[in-house]
Amino acid sequence: MLPEEQASNSRYFYELASARFGFSMDKVARCQAFHFKAGQGAKTGTGGHLPGRKVTPAIASVRGIPVGTTAVSPATFPDLATPADFKELADEVRGVTGGIPVGFKLSAQHIEEDIDFALDASADYIILDGRGGGTGSAPLIFRDHISVPTIPALARAREHLDSCGVGRGSERPVTLIVTGGLRVPADFVKAMMLGAEAVAVSNAAIQAIGCLGMRACGSNNCPVGIATQREDLRSRLVVDASAERLKNFFEASAHLMAVMARACGHHELRGFEPGDLTSWKRGVADLAGVRYAGARGRGAGEAG
């Protein structure tokens, strides 16, 4: 966690990954939400690897490791294995912070089983990361061939949460956040129609600030200065101008989503529902659990 970033943020999510680099309850106490990173859609089961050449004094200070040391994260939490283990730490976080939400980030694999694990660990929210999401560095075979694609993963997650009695309007609702390949307002709207209560973006955000999609994040040679520690390249990123572009992207996205909500007859974005969505592709309709738009082959549950 960068202290200056957290200090200027009123809604900061603390994500705890398996290596716990720089973790302390003092830092968590300054945040507004906390979640365990149990998986990432683009590199499930592989942990993390930050080359030593990227570990500058600033990064070393934040992570609590020597400058120039390669940082390797294990695939799983070494000291947390069962839902009870995670719940114990989650309760400690709530006690220290006065009860901030505690969640789980899950890659879209064994969706229902993983959600059950998170619920048993007392999750207040779930971030579901489907195939299609970005990563700075992962083997292509992982990025392109693992994880359930985001749309069917979202549909399954929404259905399962509702069946567990923790859906919207329940006594203890669990918030469903989705991410993974969602880039533009139309994607965000469709995700909310399928039951997501929030959408998280990363690739779209870095594109808004100038990413060219060169896919050189792991090389330390990002030509626009975003994913590099080389000072000659970092100087190419004009922070204030990039921040303005990012603000414009989010504001324009929210505006267009509001336009779509009004067109669907809703007074607010949370009014989106599956009935707002249809597909003329039979396979997509089946995967997403929405109405098929064709004139033939419509089942009884697809009328409308």
Regions of interest found by a model, annotated:
Residues 74-234:
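Glycine-rich phosphate/ribose-binding loops and adjacent secondary-structure elements
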Residues 237-304:
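C-terminal extensions of enzymes
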Residues 9-21, 146-150, 218-225, 288-296:
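Short, structured secondary-structure boundary patches
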Residues 4-9, 121, 125, 129, ...:
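Terminal amphipathic helices with adjacent charged low-complexity linkers/tails
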